Amino acid sequence: MAPKGGPKQQSEEDLLLQDFSRNLSAKSSALFFGNAFIVSAIPIWLYWRIWHMDLIQSAVLYSVMTLVSTYLVAFAYKNVKFVLKHKVAQKREDAVSKEVTRKLSEADNRKMSRKEKDERILWKKNEVADYEATTFSIFYNNTLFLVLVIVASFFILKNFNPTVNYILSISASSGLIALLSTGSK
């Protein structure tokens, strides 16, 4: 069965579906993996300076654990963003609608169809929701990861060998935030 609309309608539907899919744009992926790499590398300083793990001798361990942690933290970013985006969009809908309507001048308002106004409002709402969900996801997961690393390193695993402490605290912290991100609340 052929699509009912023309190519314009098909592309609009594709854009709308893209806004609600779990797939990330290349820009979002780069942002997530860049941030995840930075936050995953921060504990290296902690273990190098405080736990006295040599940088050169532990370089392979640091590299492997940082890459594993980077993947898990980026996974958590993506999941939290997806869950939050719809909630933020619902909460910001009225404010965004008022803002877009106010920005349209009276002349534009008469020339524009109701459907086109609704599309602009929907596009702006998705843009705002995407931005807010992305920034909150990064903030929330970074904070949780670093707190978990510090608690695990200095309190739970303090009597372990520094190498074992590093492996367990990084893997447990990144694994826990990845696990918590799969929840739907």
UniProtKB/Swiss-Prot annotation:
Lumenal side stretches: 1-27, 77-135
Residues the record lists as N-acetylmethionine modifications: 1
Keywords carried by this UniProt record: Acetylation, Endoplasmic reticulum, Membrane, Phosphoprotein, Transmembrane, Transmembrane helix
Record keyword Kinase present: no
UniProt-listed GO biological process terms: SRP-dependent cotranslational protein targeting to membrane
Top-level taxon in the UniProt lineage: Eukaryota
Membrane topology, Cytoplasmic segments: 49-54, 158-163
GO cellular component: endoplasmic reticulum; endoplasmic reticulum membrane
Keyword Transmembrane: yes
InterPro entries reported for this sequence: SSR3
Post-translational modification Phosphoserine, affected residues: 11, 105
Pfam families with a match to the protein in the record: TRAP-gamma (PF07074)
Known function: TRAP proteins are part of a complex whose function is to bind calcium to the ER membrane and thereby regulate the retention of ER resident proteins.
Protein's UniProt name: Translocon-associated protein subunit gamma
Annotated source species: Bos taurus (Bovine)
